[in-house]
UniProtKB/Swiss-Prot annotation:
Primary location class: cytoplasm
Job of this protein: Specifically methylates the N7 position of guanine in position 527 of 16S rRNA.
Organism: Shewanella woodyi (strain ATCC 51908 / MS32)
Protein name per UniProt: Ribosomal RNA small subunit methyltransferase G
Binding-site residues for S-adenosyl-L-methionine, renumbered to this chain: 74, 79, 125-126, 140
Catalytic activity field: guanosine(527) in 16S rRNA + S-adenosyl-L-methionine = N(7)-methylguanosine(527) in 16S rRNA + S-adenosyl-L-homocysteine
Matching Pfam families: GidB
Single GO MF annotation: rRNA (guanine-N7-)-methyltransferase activity
């Protein structure tokens, strides 16, 4: 059932995936559903809704990524980082979260599904100092762009940028962009079977 739905949604989004990638995406949903019963990793309980609201919602960003090295800040159970890593095996993703149970889940996913381009780190964002800066800083965890730029200012490389995954944009969201930053793109994302607004904001340091 999930496999058939995934095929349908990928076709709607014009995304191509190998048999192995599809197997990993479905496997991730199945593991998330299983672990969620004990670890409370997401408020969404229905695997079919997980596929839409977690997997496809994450993959809507995929074609907009530029660069090789990414960090997903406040990744939770690995969103959007794990679906993006599955679909972009040539890129590397650091998954950052401060809760140990989430990191344990991510590492089990990595082991069971054979995902080799992710690295899970248990840390608060302000305490994490990367040896090499990132081409892209991703997050769907922050309430505002302002918060994201404040807490993640030390993560991108000189040419790197921020990718903020948002729902409906607040009227004052753009007005509160701190000095020294510029919003280069506001992209309206289309997620199959999701009748809610989704946006991707790309921000750079001036």
């Amino acid at each position: 059932m999930l496999s058939a739905q995934l095929d349908e949604y990928l076709a709607e989004m014009n995304l191509s995936a190998t048999t192995e990638q599809k197997k990993q995406l479905v496997g991730f949903v199945e593991m998330l559903n299983k672990w969620n019963k004990a670890y409370n990793l997401t408020s969404i309980r229905d695997p079919q809704q997980m596929l839409i609201r977690h997997i496809m919602d994450s993959l809507a960003v995929s074609k907009h990524l530029v660069g090789e090295r990414f960090i997903d800040v406040g990744t939770g159970p690995g969103l959007p980082g794990i679906p993006l890593a599955i679909m972009n095996p040539e890129r590397s993703f650091v998954l950052l979260d401060s809760l140990g149970k989430r990191i344990r889940f991510q590492k089990q996913v990595q082991h069971e599904l054979g995902i080799h381009n992710i690295s899970s780190v248990e840390s608060r964002v302000e305490a994490f100092e990367p040896e090499v800066k990132f081409d892209g800083v991703l997050s769907r965890a922050f309430a505002s762009i302002e918060d994201m730029l404040h807490w993640c200012h030390h993560l991108p490389s000189e040419t790197g940028c921020y990718y903020a995954l948002k729902g409906q944009l607040a009227d004052n969201e753009m007005a509160n962009i701190p000095q020294g930053f510029e919003v280069t793109d506001i992209i309206e994302l289309q997620v199959p079977r999701l009748d809610e607004q989704r946006h991707l904001l790309r921000v750079i340091k001036k």
